[in-house]
Amino acid sequence: ESFDAFLATFTAEKRKKAKRERRRVAEAGIEFDTLHGGDMDDARWDAVYPFYADTFYRHGHEPYLNLDFFKRLAASMPDRIMLKVARIGRTPIAVAIFFVGSDALFGRYWGAGGNYHSLHFETCYYQGIEYCIDKKLQRFEPGTQGEHKVPRGFVPTLMSSAHFVADPRFAAAIRDFAAREARGVDSYAAAVNEHVPYHRAPDEELQL
């Protein structure tokens, strides 16, 4: 299995678009390093954390997780955290932070120090897909929401969640809303499925 074999499952139009996006990143002189927790010393974390934090600052929020959290996580779970660091020459320009499960890759955080055409798609999606192929992981979950993920190979997958309602007076209203919301989500997922890029079902589904 290879990335080209994966792209071969796309329609010609979608395959051409994905290749064009990857080519634009390469033509900009951008290269990628794959780093796991054990590869990340303080200097590397200090270099890439501002990219993660800036994603929150741009929307008027404080970062959910501080730098010390990531350093501690990498030290305690070195094989479970993976970073794709984009760079031009020796200078980092963007990072995507992933978590590695026994059979799945989970994409969670991203940030960049500038605007580069298609860099988000390459760093967060295409690089992750290549990693899954190389490591023979069965699933890649890049995070919730985002119609832009669909033409890049991710199909909508319905997920469940459980919630505790402390005040029983809210239970009926919440139950009614959840039932109506479920019907809407089913309809939306069916509509999105009409736009997946595959000309045949992929061997392993990538989850949206």
What do the PLM-derived regions correspond to, one by one?
Residues 178-192:
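Short Fe-S-cluster ligation motifs
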Residues 102-168, 175:
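Acyl-donor binding region in acyl/amide transferases
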Residues 168-179, 195:
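C-terminal "cap" of GNAT-fold acetyltransferases
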Residues 1-118, 164, 179, 196-208:
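A conserved beta-strand-loop-helix scaffold within acyl/acetyltransferase catalytic domains
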